[in-house]
C-alpha cells in the first residue's frame, strides 16, 4: 500500500531493464532460470571431476609408494640370492682345484707319512737325470705306501726289486762302478718305488701266496759289480769280465721289464697276466688298489 508521500509526488514503481545480452531468460514452464541451472550443473560436474581426479591421483600415489616399498623389501632378497650363487660358484671352483691337487685316496697312517716326509726333507737332493722332481716323488711315495698297506702280495716284490741295497760284496774286493742304462719306464718305476715308506713295508711275504719274491735281486740305477781278482788283466780277462757284467745287467733289466710290463697290463686291462709272474688271485687283488697307475705321467 502506497504511503501519502508516494501518492503526493505521484511515485510509480518500475523495473530497470538490462541489455538483451545481459538479460536473464526465464523458464516459465519450470518456473526457474535456465542459465542458473546450467551453471549449477557445470559446477557439480567440475566438483565431481575434481573429486574423481583427486581420488585417482591419491590412488596412483598410494600404488607408487606400495610398489617402491615392495622393491625395497625384495631387493635385499635378490642381492642375497646373487651373493649365494656367486659364493656357491666360488666354492665349487675351489673344490675342483683342491680335488685336482689332492691324492686319489687318503693315507691311513698319517703319522707314518709325517715322519717319512720329515725324513725325506732331510735327505740330499736326488741324482741328476731323474725323471721326477721332489714334489712328484712325494706324491708317488704316498701312492706306493697305500699299495703296500692294502695289497701285501706285491709288497715284498716291489721292496726287493727297488730297495737301495745293491750287490753284497766283501771289503777286500775291488769294485767297478757301472751305470745301468734304464729306459724311462724302468727309471720311472724305480723312482716311484724307492721313495716307499720303509716303516710300513713288511719283509715277510703273505703265506697265502706261493710266490718266492726273493728270486728278484735288488738293484738301483747304479750297480756295484764285484771284480774277480783271479781274472788276469789280459784281454781275455777283460772280455770275460765284460761278459759277466753284461749278463748281470741283462738279467736285472729283463726282470724289471717283466714286472713293469705286467703291472702296466694290470693297470690298463685289469686282467690277470700269468706270464708276468703274478698269480690269478694276486692279479685280481692288485687291480682293486690304484697306485702308480693313477699318475698321469705314467
Swiss-Prot record:
Keyword Cell membrane: no
Localization, UniProt: Cytoplasm; Nucleus, Nucleolus
UniProt superkingdom: Eukaryota
Residue span of region Disordered: 18-91, 109-128
Sequence ranges of Basic and acidic residues compositional bias: 37-61, 69-91
Swiss-Prot/TrEMBL induction comment: During sporulation. Expression is activated by IME1 during meiosis.
Keywords assigned by UniProt, alphabetized: Cytoplasm, Meiosis, Nucleus, Sporulation
Gene Ontology BP, a term: negative regulation of pseudohyphal growth
Any GO CC annotation of this UniProt entry: nucleolus
UniProt note: phenotype after gene disruption: Impairs sporulation.
Known partners and oligomeric status: Component of the MIS (mRNA N6-methyladenosine (m6A) methylation) complex, at least composed of IME4, KAR4, MUM2, SLZ1, and VIR1. Interacts with VIR1.
Family: Belongs to the ZC3H13 family.
Role noted for this protein: Component of the MIS complex, a complex that mediates N6-methyladenosine (m6A) methylation of meiotic mRNAs and is required for initiation of meiosis, progression through the meiotic divisions and sporulation. In the complex, mediates the entry of the MIS complex in nucleolus, where methylation takes place.
UniProt protein name: Sporulation-specific with a leucine zipper motif protein 1
Organism listed in the record: Saccharomyces cerevisiae (strain ATCC 204508 / S288c)
Amino acid at each position: 500500500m502506497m504511503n501519502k508521500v508516494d501518492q503526493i509526488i505521484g511515485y510509480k514503481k518500475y523495473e530497470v531493464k538490462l541489455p538483451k545480452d545481459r538479460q536473464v531468460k526465464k523458464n516459465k514452464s519450470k518456473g526457474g532460470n535456465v542459465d542458473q541451472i546450467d551453471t549449477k550443473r557445470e559446477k557439480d560436474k567440475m566438483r565431481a571431476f575434481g573429486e574423481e581426479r583427486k581420488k585417482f591421483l591419491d590412488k596412483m600415489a598410494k600404488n607408487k609408494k606400495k610398489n617402491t616399498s615392495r622393491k625395497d623389501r625384495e631387493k635385499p632378497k635378490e642381492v642375497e640370492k646373487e651373493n649365494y650363487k656367486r659364493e656357491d660358484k666360488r666354492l665349487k671352483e675351489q673344490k675342483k682345484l683342491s680335488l685336482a691337487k689332492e691324492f686319489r685316496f687318503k693315507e691311513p697312517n698319517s703319522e707314518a707319512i709325517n715322519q717319512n716326509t720329515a725324513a725325506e726333507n732331510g735327505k740330499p737332493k736326488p741324482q741328476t737325470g731323474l725323471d721326477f722332481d721332489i714334489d712328484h716323488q712325494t706324491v708317488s711315495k704316498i701312492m706306493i705306501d697305500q699299495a703296500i698297506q692294502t695289497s701285501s702280495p706285491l709288497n715284498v716284490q716291489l721292496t726287493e726289486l727297488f730297495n737301495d741295497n745293491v750287490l753284497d760284496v766283501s771289503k777286500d774286493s775291488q769294485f767297478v762302478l757301472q751305470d745301468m742304462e734304464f729306459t724311462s719306464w724302468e727309471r720311472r718305476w724305480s723312482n716311484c718305488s724307492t721313495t716307499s715308506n720303509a716303516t710300513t713295508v713288511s719283509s715277510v711275504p703273505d703265506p697265502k701266496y706261493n710266490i718266492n719274491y726273493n728270486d728278484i735281486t735288488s738293484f738301483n740305477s747304479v750297480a756295484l759289480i764285484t771284480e774277480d781278482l783271479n781274472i788276469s788283466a789280459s784281454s781275455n780277462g777283460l772280455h770275460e769280465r765284460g761278459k759277466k757284467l753284461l749278463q748281470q745287467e741283462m738279467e736285472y733289466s729283463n726282470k724289471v721289464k717283466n714286472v713293469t710290463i705286467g703291472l702296466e697290463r694290470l693297470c690298463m686291462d685289469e686282467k690277470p697276466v700269468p706270464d708276468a709272474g703274478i698269480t690269478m688271485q694276486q692279479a685280481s687283488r692288485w687291480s682293486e688298489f690304484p697306485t702308480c697307475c693313477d699318475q698321469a705321467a705314467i
